[in-house]
Design a protein with these regions (language model features):
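Membrane-interface helix-loop-helix junctions at boundaries between adjacent transmembrane segments
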Residues: 20-92, 102-106
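Transmembrane helical segments that form the transport core of multi-pass membrane transport proteins
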Residues: 126-179
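Alpha-helical transmembrane segments in multi-pass membrane proteins
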Residues: 3, 7-11, 29, 33, ...
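Membrane-helix interface "capping/anchor" motifs
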Residues: 1, 39-50, 157-164, 200-209
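Conserved small/polar residues in nucleotide/adenosyl-binding loops
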Residues: 224-231
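Membrane-water interface at loop-to-transmembrane-helix junctions
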Residues: 106-126
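Central hydrophobic cores of alpha-helical transmembrane segments
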Residues: 51-59, 147, 191-196, 212-217
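Structural signature of hydrophobic alpha-helical transmembrane segments
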Residues: 16-29, 138-142, 185-187
Length: 231
């Protein structure tokens, strides 16, 4: 239960705080927040919980809100936290536990494969966003998400996924260009949605990567107001 509270507390506060800082202090906040998320939620590495918790953090970081919208975001996260706690208690209340909350921190060891993976993912994701911010490029979270998706607990898996990622990024770009040329301009805003549907129906990572490029390229077109290739 304490781990759930800790995870949601980080999601409520750290992304908003990091967005108020310059790139280097924000990097420090991201390192601390992501490492804590890994320790609290990713002890069982084969569950790939980082793809939920760290991804959630990066999305909250990238889509920043303030004022009344931030209050509503916190309220929504609080409701989600309570719901998760209720479900967790209902399903796990009779299960014996041999570890306490503080054992999660005691077992953090850089000599273990799990501990090294925690630190590796944390530094790679945070550094990618730092470089994007220092270069003044928008949407730094996308660099973090891309790095997170290939930084897996097992090295062999990282190599295989990295190879398929760049190949299917090219495939996704090619399909996007075809859609951009074929569809009427009024349909351009929906290309990202088409990609989202494609991701949902893709069972494997390669095609998920291909369809994910639709959203990224759609945002790029809006950011840089690229003229239509027909012009």
């Amino acid at each position: 239960m304490l781990s759930i509270v800790g995870i949601f507390a980080i999601l409520m506060t750290a992304p908003r705080f990091a967005n108020t800082l310059s790139p280097v202090p924000a990097f420090a906040v991201n390192v601390i927040a992501i490492l804590l998320l890994m320790i609290l939620g990713c002890h069982n590495v084969i569950m790939y919980n980082h793809s939920t918790f760290v991804l959630g953090y990066l999305l909250l970081l990238g889509y920043d809100v303030t004022g009344a919208s931030y209050i509503k975001r916190v309220e929504g996260l609080a409701a989600g936290m309570i719901l998760c706690m209720i479900i967790f208690y209902k399903n796990q209340k009779n299960r014996p536990y041999r570890r306490t909350f503080f054992d999660l921190f005691r077992e953090f060891d850089l000599h273990s494969a799990r501990g090294r993976w925690y630190l590796k993912l944390t530094l790679i994701v945070s550094s990618a966003m730092l470089f994007m911010n220092l270069l003044g490029l928008p949407r730094a979270m996308w660099a973090g998400i891309a790095c997170m998706s290939v930084c897996l607990p097992f090295t062999n898996d990282c190599v295989a996924r990295s190879g398929s990622r760049w190949q299917f990024n090219i495939v996704g770009c090619a399909i996007f260009i075809v859609l951009y040329l074929v569809l009427p301009e009024s349909m351009y805003p929906y290309i990202g949605m088409i990609g989202g549907i494609g991701v949902g129906y893709s069972a494997g990572y390669p095609w998920q990567t291909a369809f994910n490029t639709f959203g990224a390229l759609s945002i790029a077109c809006l950011l840089y107001t690229s003229p239509s290739p027909r012009d």
